[in-house]
Design a protein with these regions (language model features):
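Short, surface-exposed linear segments at secondary-structure transitions and domain or protein termini
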Residues: 23-34
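Short, surface-exposed loop and linker segments with low hydrophobicity and enrichment for Pro/Ser/Thr
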Residues: 1-2, 34-36
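Short aromatic-glycine-(Arg/Gly/Cys) micro-motifs in beta-strand/loop hairpins
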Residues: 1-13
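Short, mixed-charge low-complexity intrinsically disordered segments
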Residues: 36-69
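Terminal low-complexity, poorly structured segments
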Residues: 12, 32, 48-50
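A short, exposed loop/beta-hairpin motif centered on an aromatic-Gly-Thr core
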Residues: 13-24
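Polar low-complexity intrinsically disordered regions enriched in Ser/Thr and small residues
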Residues: 7, 15-17, 34, 43, ...
Length: 69
């Protein structure tokens, strides 16, 4: 199964951030991103993903591919 790391904005909209084949790996990524949010960071920059403005992001979570829309 594929798991999506999804972030939700303060307005309640969910967006796919990344995908992982293992639930544990997806949970680790979501946890690291939530830790980053807790520091007050406003920008995420990754050589694979690119830039993500964190100012409107509420939290990251993991959802099975069957629940993603």
């Amino acid at each position: 199964m594929i798991y999506g790391i999804v972030y939700y904005t303060k307005s309640g909209r969910g967006y796919l951030f990344q995908q992982a084949f293992e639930e544990q790996h997806a949970m680790e990524i979501a946890g690291k991103m939530n830790d980053l949010l807790a520091t007050g960071a406003t920008m995420y920059n990754d050589k694979f993903y690119g830039k993500l403005d964190l100012r409107d992001v509420e939290y990251f979570t993991v959802e099975p591919s069957s629940e993603m829309y």
